[in-house]
């Protein structure tokens, strides 16, 4: 890859964009980018000859088609490298979350995630706070379910702590992403299904749901039913302005911990044992 590339922007009446782009493609076969009244072309080759050809065409057509030209030489950025450098590993509780182009870190439980989005890679406040809560709540041998699992990072965290882990998501793409991330970490989930918590069988020591507030309220009955007596429910994805609405749906549980990070709230509830 060369250090520089050339960018030629042609501004013209939008009705002539197709005509001029066809002409350009006859003299230069690299791709074009279009906007209203604009044609943009980029190449590692000097595009002066294209500009000169269009100026000559414009002169030949006299004033029928008017074009303005802007030819710039720009730094050629390696976008993949630039993206990789922008994604930094993070430490959250006992966990070190890192992309595959970094090395694991000694002294932490390592989770490898190649993020497509910040959400689900540990960088988003809700995921970060859930990882901290999992660090303090989940223990080896626990039965855990991750509801709305997304990338699967929270279920992976519980698995690496020695728990039995089940995961579900209503989005089939999330289910596939979860499978890929478990494979990337050489881990094996115990159950994974497309759907929600209503398909779960039995109860769990820890139920994790990092979903938006309105959905948490909608499935609150199923979430609470899935927690065994003495177990925990970790809720996140809650904007602070909706916190009280969510709390109203879970007031029959004991609130053990509240975390506010940025504008996002994470709540850890305990389902008390019933005497007798």
Swiss-Prot record:
Question: Which CDD domains is this protein grouped with?
Answer: AdoMet_MTases
Location, primary (coarse class): cytoplasm
GO biological process: any one? methylation
Residues annotated for S-adenosyl-L-methionine binding in this entry: 127, 148, 169, 210
Q: Which UniProt keywords apply?
A: Cytoplasm, Methyltransferase, S-adenosyl-L-methionine, Transferase
> Which reaction is catalysed here?
L-lysyl-[protein] + 3 S-adenosyl-L-methionine = N(6),N(6),N(6)-trimethyl-L-lysyl-[protein] + 3 S-adenosyl-L-homocysteine + 3 H(+)
EC number, as in UniProt = 2.1.1.-
Molecular function as annotated in GO:
protein-lysine N-methyltransferase activity
Instruction: List localization entries.
Output: Cytoplasm
One Pfam match, given by its short name, reads: PrmA
> Is Cytoplasm one of the keywords?
yes
Q: Which domain of life is it from?
A: Bacteria
One Gene Ontology term, aspect cellular component? cytoplasm
Q: What SUPFAM superfamilies does UniProt report for this protein, alphabetically? A: S-adenosyl-L-methionine-dependent methyltransferases
Record NCBIfam families: PRK00517.2-4, prmA
Give the function comment from the record: Methylates ribosomal protein L11.
For this chain, the family text in UniProt reads: Belongs to the methyltransferase superfamily. PrmA family.
PANTHER family, per database record: ELECTRON TRANSFER FLAVOPROTEIN BETA SUBUNIT LYSINE METHYLTRANSFERASE
In Swiss-Prot or TrEMBL terms, this protein is called Ribosomal protein L11 methyltransferase
Please name the gene that encodes this protein: prmA
